[in-house]
Amino acid sequence: MWESPAVLRIMAFGTTFWTMTSLARQDALVTFSSHSMSFRAIVDAGYHDRRIVSEDSRIFYQCLLAYNGNYEVTPMYLPVSMDTVRDDRWWKSVKNLYAQQRRWAWGVEHIPYLISEFRKKGKLIPFWKKFKWVFIEWEGKWSWALVALIITILGRLPM
């Protein structure tokens, strides 16, 4: 971590901070990155989808559908350390960071998946729960994409 350029450490801190603050929304947690789940749940969900980029969080939605909306994430409070991309050359490190962020942005693929699958398989899931999960995905990707612009524009308005 400390061998990475400062700009990458700042980005890694921002990501860690965002992740930690999202733990406050217990009802909106989705699996991602390193998670643990039972093999039974993986089988019931139809295994990981190998055709998508962000399969680590898609498995949550597959389980949500397989269990008719009765599936949730329970956070495990374990010590973690920040990590970041790193290369011997500064510019290559920045390119690697961009590639990492681009991969995370692929999570937007969950929005059409949820809309489609809720129509097909989500008959027993209450409408409010379907709406909640589509909104959480949409709001998260929308705010992530626009937060820099919003801060820049609204930050200049008088109080």
Predicted region positions:
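Long helical/loop segments within the catalytic core of UDP-sugar-dependent glycosyltransferases
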Residues: M1-V53, L64-Y67, V85-Y113
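Short active-site alpha-helical segment characteristic of glycosyltransferases
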Residues: I59-Q62, G69
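Active-site micro-motifs of SAM-dependent methyltransferase domains
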Residues: V43-D44, I59, V80
